[in-house]
Amino acid sequence: GVVREGDFLLHEDGSYSLSNGDEDVLEVIDGSEMLITRSLQNWHTHLPMTLNRSMGEGMALMDWLQTSIFPSERNLTPELASIGTRASVAEMISGGTTFACDMYHFPSAIAPIVADSGIRGIVCGPTTDWPPAEEGEEDSGNAIRELESMIRSGPLGSGRVEIGIATHAVYTCSEEVLRKASEMSRELGARLHIHTSETREEVAQCHEKTGMYPIEYLDSIDYFTEGTVCAHCGWVTKKEMRILARNDSHAVHCPVSNQKLACGGTMSYPAMIEAGVDVRLGTDGAASNNGLDMRAEAKTASLIQKHDHWDATILNPLETWQLATKGSSDWVTWDLTDIRMRPRGRGSRRVLSNLIYSGTSCLDVFVDGIAIRRSGKTLTLNEERVSLDLEEAAQDYYSEI
């Protein structure tokens, strides 16, 4: 089976080994009723957008953005971004997620919170002002100067939190902005993060304007740098998949958000793997998910891939969990006494399937060998205070909408 039973030593560097029972250890944890796994990794999200959770329900993507999200974001301040981020991080830790690749405004407000929480992250900030310059006015350049300064200052949280560069999408960023971001990425060694081929409309508009599909277009302007994070990739040709593979890019599957916004296209996981693309999993923001539960995202990814390809063998439990935890060096323990984890089956052979498709409570979270959650309680954030702050902040955020 895929589950091993026994006594294990967890090492600070993220490795583990079998215990002989006589080692000098910092702490002994009774894991007899626990399942320990690698932690979940959220490769595309917008952390402050817990402020927008359940806002503008039942709208098409572009209508939702233009009438709900973008107008509210004009009220966004660094303080509000901090409050939303703190809530998102608390939610992720409570669900066993220890990494987030974020894309949003005010990275200088977001990154310290991610670092202080004890998790890992890539906090990607924009290169243009927010709110944007009025028509006819020039961008002040403040955003890109601040972002460059943050990148040059180096990672936060003992190296756990990097700063990256966000370019929203081909339909919101000019060629000049995209080229500048790519140059900055090469010069500073910072990660690029972009939405790609999320909707038919986006793809059709790009093709009409440039004669190319979005990923082809980005390749034609030499946008990609190593490790570029491409969110969604729901309407992608096989040629574009080969471009992603050639550029060592990550294609991030966000199935819950795509279904909720009726984007229509589902990333073809088998075709991506066949093309050699590195696929990751993400929730998108709480505005379009509406949660940040990566276990639920893994379940949804497995189900939609089986359904769309008429093939129940795609993304079996082990492959699904490997997709959701890819790159993790941290640990999470799960409650095996929860009724949702029964029956375990002979040799605990049903445990991983139960975890993915049924669920249970996250008990402990360890990052860099340090506990940030124990016995179901997060140690680095006051969840009750965070929750109340979010509720209060939302009232101000929507006051003029």
Language-model segments: what does each one mean?
Residues 192-199, 262-264, 271-297, 326-333:
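Short acidic/histidine-rich active-site segments
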Residues 51-83, 122-140, 200-227, 247-250, ...:
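Active-site gating loops and adjacent loop-to-helix segments of metal-dependent hydrolytic enzymes
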Residues 1-24, 35:
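N-terminal metal-binding scaffold of metallo-dependent hydrolase/deaminase domains
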Residues 109-239:
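Metal-coordinating catalytic core of metallo-dependent amide/deamination hydrolases
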Residues 330-379, 383-387:
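C-terminal cap of metal-dependent C-N hydrolases
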Residues 53-119, 143-157, 391-399:
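Alpha-helical scaffold segments that flank or form the walls of functional sites
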Residues 85-92, 250, 258-263, 305-345, ...:
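C-terminal helical cap
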